[in-house]
Amino acid sequence: IQTGKYVASPGCHASGFIALVYPLIAAGLLDRGALLTATSLTGYSGGGKKMIAEYEASERSELLKGPMPYALGQSHKHLPEMQKQCGLENAPVFVPVVGNFYSGMLVTLPLHASLLKGAPSSDALRAVYKNPYPLGLVHVSGEAPSALYANAYAGRDDMEIFVSGADGRLLVSALFDNLGKGASGAAIECFNLMRGAPADAGLTLG
């Protein structure tokens, strides 16, 4: 990025997925041929002006009060990016879900420990995630939450990774703002790096 003339920042869903999967592959814990599934819960701002207008209309459908899984035909536009940037041999089964809130995103990757070399503990996974992200914009929580709110990082430009689960059934989750670290915040971060500024210059962090 520092020496690039043109830099493309990743899509919002892809940002969370890549942040969770790539470090596992780079560390040799996850095979590139692994068959993965992921869900991503996003605020309705991710759907652009048309969807924002639908959700904020004075007379809107009652159906919009509930979560809406979409792209069920496995044709989401971020899938090729997710597969390519992680070096996966197979595209994941991906379920994006729009929620009744403006912004925020929670990407979750369920993993059986048997998929990971050596069946690492939750603490070992947290250590893996700490190594690739030295710029201070991706944090790794030391806690194992029993619940996460997808809009908790709305208005922020950083990301937090959580590891939870038990009995060999693990969940790794990326919590961030689809409009921040998932969009404009990531673009500003890249611009900062290209011009030799601190990565977090002008960004809103927790």
Regions found by a protein language model. Give the residues of each.
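Glycine-/Pro-rich loop/turn segments that contact NAD(P) or position catalytic residues
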Residues: 1-37, 42-57
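A glycine-rich, Thr/Ser-enriched phosphate-binding loop motif common to dinucleotide/cofactor-binding enzymes
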Residues: 8-19, 70-77, 179-188
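Helix N-cap/coil-helix junction residues
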Residues: 29-30, 88, 197
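C-terminal substrate-binding/catalytic lobe of Rossmann-fold NAD(P)-dependent oxidoreductases
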Residues: 34-35, 39, 44-173
